[in-house]
UniProtKB/Swiss-Prot annotation:
Compartment annotation: Cell inner membrane
Sequence intervals crossing the membrane: 11-31, 43-63, 82-102, 141-161, 192-212, 216-236, 290-310, 316-336, 363-383
GO BP, sorted A to Z: serine transport; threonine transport
Gene Ontology terms: cellular component: plasma membrane
InterPro entries tied to this protein: Na-dicarboxylate_symporter, Na:dicarbo_symporter_sf, Ser_Thr_transp_SstT
Family label: Belongs to the dicarboxylate/amino acid:cation symporter (DAACS) (TC 2.A.23) family.
Organismal lineage: Bacteria, Pseudomonadati, Pseudomonadota, Gammaproteobacteria, Alteromonadales
Domain of life: Bacteria
SUPFAM superfamilies reported for this sequence: Proton glutamate symport protein
Function (record text): Involved in the import of serine and threonine into the cell, with the concomitant import of sodium (symport system).
Principal subcellular localization: membrane
Any one GO molecular function term: neutral L-amino acid:sodium symporter activity
PANTHER family the record matches: PROTON/GLUTAMATE-ASPARTATE SYMPORTER, SERINE_THREONINE TRANSPORTER SSTT
Name of protein: Serine/threonine transporter SstT
Length: 408
């Protein structure tokens, strides 16, 4: 019995990244050995993602309300520089995608459109959807995972409780701590969940269908790699004036890997919160910036919208001048910030960007269908970039504020 508990303790305290790596290798091996067996363990991945998605809304709501209610007067939360970083990073991602798309123009083999999808008719509709999400019923927001609404009600409750008695504030702090403990437990199950996700993905797709879109994927993933490994570190260096790579690599390893396999920014919120706690960041800051980042920090989405739109334009023989490309960068960045307000995310915002070049909705929906074909890799890489960048920019802004305070 003692030996069993010792083994469990070793597993619980061992390197999570190493355990996830073992899970990935085991998942690929099982799918290679037996497709049927791999499909049988798919439920492990679904359970893991389901658990993260279930706890994320209540975690965000309680953590935001608790941190604002318990916030000391004159406490600096650094939210303005973080939001600026989010918006600048998203625009830089769109611009990078434009440059790469023009250097390596891609032709698409267009397929049938996606049935039953309804893309937004314009940027106004995207903003309108986001505004209505802001005033959603709080219970409905928690049930449906509407993080714009959850943030709004969490901030409102926190401000209302700011002048409450210390015992009331302590209750919220204790509940927040309890939920954080539950999150840590769920995150320790990541190797098992990722094993199920990897096995199911390889068994169901085998990535054969994706091979025909190798050049398109190379441009997409190349743009995302440039943002993750060159542009983001450069932005962080400007903020903190030291080598940014230890922070960037740690965030990619501890946040990006999990996000890659869960393919859900919402499911990765608890992982990012736990990482911010490990980095000893200010709770008042990250409890708001991380869920906000999952909503508006969409560099990966901006890349997807831009690359697929320019690929469609090139396929149809449409010449794109520099000014139009710049305008596309702005539209893609704004649209990407609203991706969380659209069912289907970044892919269903492609028709909006295609309308800049007079591309018909029928053709645009065929481009969306191409996006769904490569979605296994595109969506995973996009989520990994988006989610890890939330922590990178939050940490950079917090450290920059600390350095400024030390200098007086």
């Amino acid at each position: 019995m003692k030996q069993e508990s010792s083994l469990l303790a070793k597993l619980a305290n061992g390197s999570l990244v190493l355990q996830i790596l073992v899970g990935i290798i085991a998942g690929v091996s099982l799918a290679s050995f037996s497709h049927e067996a791999a499909k049988q363990v798919a439920f492990l991945g679904s359970l893991f993602v389901g658990a993260l998605k279930a706890i994320a809304p209540i975690l965000v709501f309680i953590l935001v309300a608790s941190s604002i209610a318990n916030q000391k007067k004159n406490t600096q939360t650094n939210m303005r520089p973080i939001v600026v970083l989010y918006l600048f990073g998203t625009f830089a991602a769109a611009l990078t995608a434009v440059v790469l798309s023009m250097m390596f123009p891609t032709n698409l083999v267009l397929v049938a459109g996606v049935e039953g999808t309804s893309p937004p008719q314009g940027i106004g509709e995207v903003i309108n959807t986001l505004l209505f999400k802001l005033v959603d019923n709080p219970v409905n927001a928690l049930m449906t995972g509407n993080y714009i609404g959850i943030l709004a009600w969490g901030v409102g409750l926190g401000l209302a409780l700011h002048h409450a008695s210390d015992s009331t504030k302590q209750v919220f702090a204790d509940v927040s701590h309890g939920i954080s403990q539950m999150v840590r437990f769920i995150i320790r199950l990541a190797p098992i969940g990722i094993f199920g996700l990897v096995a199911a993905t390889f068994a169901e797709t085998g990535f054969a269908a994706i091979a025909g879109y190798a050049k398109l994927l190379a441009v997409l993933l190349g743009a995302m790699a440039i943002i993750a490994l060159i542009v983001n570190p450069l932005i962080v260096y400007v903020k903190i004036k030291r080598n940014p790579y230890p922070l960037v690599i740690r965030c990619l390893r501890e946040s990006g890997v999990t996000a890659f396999f869960t393919r859900s920014s919402a499911a990765n919120i608890p992982v990012n919160m736990a990482l911010c706690e490990k980095l000893k960041l200010h709770e008042d800051t990250y409890s708001v910036s991380i869920p906000l980042g999952a909503t508006i920090n969409m560099g990966g989405a901006a890349i997807t919208i831009t690359v697929l739109t320019l690929a469609a334009a090139h396929t149809l023989g449409i010449q794109v001048d520099l000014l139009t490309a710049l305008l596309l960068s702005v539209v893609a960045a704004i649209s990407a910030c609203g991706a969380s307000g659209v069912a289907g995310g970044s892919l269903l915002l492609i028709p909006l960007a295609c309308s800049l070049f007079g591309i018909s909705n029928d053709v645009a929906m065929q481009v969306v269908a191409v996006g769904f074909i490569i979605g296994v890799i595109q969506d995973a890489a996009e989520t990994a970039l988006n989610s890890s960048t939330d922590v990178i920019f939050t940490a950079a802004a917090c450290e920059a504020a600390e350095n400024k305070a030390k200098l007086g």
